[in-house]
């Protein structure tokens, strides 16, 4: 029975969302299949999955809770793949099915946007939020219940942004107050924050759709009571949790994961390192990273200390992934903008709290100046 429709067939969702769905089904806490469609015209992955009976493998490689993980997870939770362009009737039928309850999407950061020139009659050749508006109107007209939307696009307030776009299209297309009320009161739009390094497509036996990723995963979901009853992922011990707001977790991710990257990369490159793993395996440089992380960055974040410490430890563990050669020069791109967004906030917060400059973050800034 199809309970989930997913807009997005790329490596990230197949290594992230399907992993959660598969785990929930295997543990007996969920009984639902997913249908996948591509949000754009390119149907190469959809066709490749169809040739494999909609099955593929996730290759999990990395460190988790102190252990080296090198595992394969077979995925068979996909009921069908739908070509958005060539199989519009199938897409509409699935969207209007009685069993459907959850929509997952990843249409890139540019996917959730509004275009006043989009017209309903041009479906499916319209933007993703316009497609959803068109399909939701079909579902509303068929008398079906509202849906829960779980966008994982990496923009702030992704659920709210999707909802706002849909409401704009509803007004643009004169879909009526009853439909607008349906969207606002019968549907739930969740803000989310996701985190997993997906290294991409890999060769695995005869599987043309195999994808590789780290074992670590985090899925923070800002959901109302209706959505919490529908979403099964928090029942699986894989880093998914409901939260009153994703904003503190976004701040945590930016300051710790992204911030430590930026704090260490240029100083590390200046010290002669080439990849991230070598930095954290050098005792002297690791001490530098831990001092900046524990004594400066963590001191500026107002969250549960136990959770902060656990997350910080997982970040260092992820940096030491023996299967990923993460090049410092690749991470160094746009470092000035990255330092401003990821490290300057911690620098200023520390200064305002303690009345003095943080030594490690100051050294990181010196490394930035020296690099350029």
Predicted feature residues:
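Substrate/ligand-engaging "lid" and interaction regions
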Residues: 1-372
